[in-house]
Design a protein with these regions (language model features):
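Bacterial N-terminal signal peptides
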Residues: 19-27
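Bacterial N-terminal signal peptides that target proteins for export
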Residues: 4-20
Length: 373
């Protein structure tokens, strides 16, 4: 795989691949939520987080007053609570997590001290849809930190038993919570595995599901679950493939599809699935483009679009992809060109158009997060 120079390179890329461009969409009172939302972008090399007001109509980015905002040491992943009151950023070199209050009038953010301890080199965050628990992948300590979230203050409290182990040398770089909030899936960048955990109801305690971990391709760098919770998709950055596994909703167990893995672009590192579960978008770090696939709702098989023809050009070294809450736009964070590409999504065909630069951010972005409408 071009441009990946050992694990250090992979981790540095995850900062880019975890480009938590936390797109805070709609739902911000006083922000004319019917016409705009807010996007938050992590900029680890400048220890800051950029914020933009985004048009729901055109997808145009306009910098929020005061942006970029000071963050922790190398913030590379950001998520928002469902009420859009709080933002959380994983600080890779600080080994901690920052909590920010979101100003509902301006979209600005202010950090609440002290920061919360994490494992060694937290590089990815995920939250359940209820906003009850926050999960952090610690790449250097090969474990998962789990926190309960105070709905009133946003303060994090580590749950009993946290951090939870993966395997020695697993180097987890990506994780996602299933839509039901019952399961957590974690990608091991070094072992070619996905770990599956059940999430204790009310406790957040993790327990590996039967037969976990599950074998995927080489260098898994992103993991996603379809909205119906039938399939798990994994972007394998070193083998240029996408693994697809069926999900047993009663146990959380995964079973690889017969013809999996499927051919992808060059160095796929980030994925986004539309809310209807019809289309899958994959940022290809080495190809400087985005691949688009239609998804068979029955079999889970991805088929790359031919009309319009995939892949679609992005910026230089696209590391993160996300769909905004309107479902109309795909935003891609580009590491080397230091910008965000914006695409219009055709809801009928899944095709992408425009692809122009929505915003220049000055330093390498590493993740995008969006609010719910």
């Amino acid at each position: 795989m071009a441009d990946f120079k050992g694990m250090n390179g992979m981790i540095a890329l995850k900062r880019v691949a975890l480009i938590c461009v936390s797109l805070v969409l709609a739902g911000l009172a006083g922000c004319s939520s019917s016409s705009t939302h807010i996007a938050y972008v992590t900029l680890p090399t400048s220890n800051s987080i950029a914020a933009f007001r985004v048009s729901n109509h055109s997808g145009k980015f306009t910098s929020v007053v005061g942006s970029p905002f000071a963050g922790g040491n190398s913030p590379n992943s950001i998520v928002l609570d469902p009420a859009n009151k709080f933002a959380y950023a994983a600080n890779q070199t600080g080994n901690d997590i920052s909590l920010f209050m979101i100003d509902s009038s301006t979209g600005g953010i202010s950090e609440v001290m002290p920061r919360t301890r994490a494992g060694i080199s937290p590089v990815a965050l995920a939250m359940d849809s209820a906003g009850a628990f926050l999960f952090a992948a610690n790449v250097s300590s090969s474990d998962i930190s789990v926190y309960s979230i105070n709905a009133g203050t946003g303060v994090l409290t580590e749950v009993s038993g946290s951090p939870f182990p993966t395997s020695a040398g697993a180097s987890p770089v990506a994780l996602t919570v299933s839509p039901s909030g019952k399961y957590l899936y974690v990608a091991s960048s070094t072992l070619g595995l996905v770990f599956g955990y059940s999430i204790g109801s009310g406790t957040g305690v993790l327990q590996q599901v039967p037969d976990s971990p599950f074998t995927v391709g080489s260098g898994p760098f992103s993991v996603a679950v379809d909205p119906a919770e039938h399939f798990v998709y994994v972007a394998n950055s070193l083998s240029d493939t996408i693994s697809v596994l069926s999900l047993d909703s009663s146990t959380g167990m995964l079973t690889s599809l017969p013809n999996s893995p499927f051919t992808a672009g060059t160095n796929p590192v980030s994925m986004a699935i539309d809310s209807a579960g019809k289309f899958l978008y994959v940022a290809n770090l080495g190809g400087n483009n985005v691949s688009a696939f239609s998804l068979d709702s029955t079999t889970g098989v991805p088929t790359e679009l031919t009309t319009p023809k995939s892949p679609f050009a992005a910026g230089t070294r696209p590391i993160f992809a996300t769909i905004d809450s309107t479902g109309k736009f795909l935003y891609v964070a580009n590491e080397n060109s230091r910008d965000i590409s914006g695409f219009n999504i055709d809801s009928s065909t899944g095709g992408l158009t425009n692809g122009s630069i929505a915003a220049s951010v000055g330093s390498a972005p590493t993740s995008v997060a969006t609010t719910t409408k």
